[in-house]
Amino acid sequence: MVMELHNHTPFSIYFITSILFIFFVFFKLVQRSDSKTSSTCKLPPGPRTLPLIGNIHQIVGSLPVHYYLKNLADKYGPLMHLKLGEVSNIIVTSPEMAQEIMKTHDLNFSDRPDFVLSRIVSYNGSGIVFSQHGDYWRQLRKICTVELLTAKRVQSFRSIREEEVAELVKKIAATASEEGGSIFNLTQSIYSMTFGIAARAAFGKKSRYQQVFISNMHKQLMLLGGFSVADLYPSSRVFQMMGATGKLEKVHRVTDRVLQDIIDEHKNRNRSSEEREAVEDLVDVLLKFQKESEFRLTDDNIKAVIQDIFIGGGETSSSVVEWGMSELIRNPRVMEEAQAEVRRVYDSKGYVDETELHQLIYLKSIIKETMRLHPPVPLLVPRVSRERCQINGYEIPSKTRIIINAWAIGRNPKYWGETESFKPERFLNSSIDFRGTDFEFIPFGAGRRICPGITFAIPNIELPLAQLLYHFDWKLPNKMKNEELDMTESNGITLRRQNDLCLIPITRLP
């Protein structure tokens, strides 16, 4: 150590001293700022902060972020203040506090933070998910609920869903027919199937651009996962140019070109009125608002909405199907009951379609229980306060980010007995639903910013699960026991398995 110190030049010693002095001054300013804030504003409780990083060190590790946030909330309460970098965040982990945010004060918390990475992929916040609350958002949401994602429109995609799921069943059957019982990667095939449904619903027939688009959407989601340094230090120009920004822009340029080609193809296609009515896809619907409406969408607006639909209808649906099958493998009693129900309903037909899905009451309970334990988006898309307000006796300053931990709320022991156990029966004689009125169960959010694509997502979950249970029995490879199945979660925007779900399918003989 002495040798190293002597080897420093006067310039380097001066430089180090200057850095230490700047750090000391900054530390004092942070202390003064924090003490001033705490003396004038009664924030919710939270752990002590460190200079520069705040509480970042307490949510970084080998586990997904929602675990750390729940553990901290167990100590500091369901309305908790965290300083992440230079940004104040309020973490919500109880149904009561979620109701305050998404119902009582819903309008005040209806804006989105201006995240650097989401700004890139959402075309400056022009999609339904990341746009700010206002006239544009209201018009866009109206298009989604009245035109784009109505029950009638979603039902018109029934043949697409049935064809894509039939292709999946065919692939599995081919594997099951191989000698010795071959292993099938269910994760990859489910992901491909749900995105295939979303692609055909959005673009019409199978597009030559489809695989490139799906691949790039997956890359975008990976780069969007977690906290961006630029969003933790929004005042720093240096951080704005660092991190995943360059990588994301590169991937997004490819996605943008593909979407523009698809839009141009739709514009140039001449259709008769009869053909348009028969096969109208989501791009067709959105393009009508470039011609026949006072509220005109640009090409970039359309691209942003299509991406939102892909994430809601493809990524989240595949996550629920994947976790549903994982839980069924780990709980053979539930698997047997679910298979018995599906086979009882469909055996007279000999095949599964959507006409009788409403009769699968136990399967619907399985889906709800899956979303309780594994919500597709564990930390709901953050909100930001528009004005200063008071919640539960605490002050929430304006421009404060709000993070709602839906994963933790689904494990709240006050509302759920045996929180870690997979028990679909808890929903059988219960009116609790996922449409935003029961705040102990909010996998799709609630209030003004609830996911508008629920009607699009649910059939993409019910039909595949029913088919997988009807046609096949399932077992783990390498003589693994059911309880040995790894259930580790990956870190990211959506809740996925860390390791792919690989099973041995056994074709069921009628």
From Swiss-Prot:
- List the SUPFAM superfamilies hit by this protein, alphabetically: Cytochrome P450
Is Iron among the key words of this record? yes
Q: Cofactor(s) for this protein? A: heme
Q: What is its EC number?
A: 1.14.-.-
Q: What class of enzyme is it?
A: oxidoreductase
Q: Does the keyword Metal-binding apply?
A: yes
Any GO MF annotation of the entry: heme binding
Annotated CDD domains: CYP71-like (cd11072)
Q: Name one Pfam family in it.
A: p450
Q: Which InterPro entries match?
A: Cyt_P450, Cyt_P450_CS, Cyt_P450_E_grp-I, Cyt_P450_sf
- Protein keywords: Heme, Iron, Metal-binding, Monooxygenase, Oxidoreductase
Per UniProt, heme binds at 451
Give the domain of life.
Eukaryota
State the family it belongs to: Belongs to the cytochrome P450 family.
Database matches in PROSITE patterns: CYTOCHROME_P450
Name by which UniProt lists this protein:
Cytochrome P450 71D10
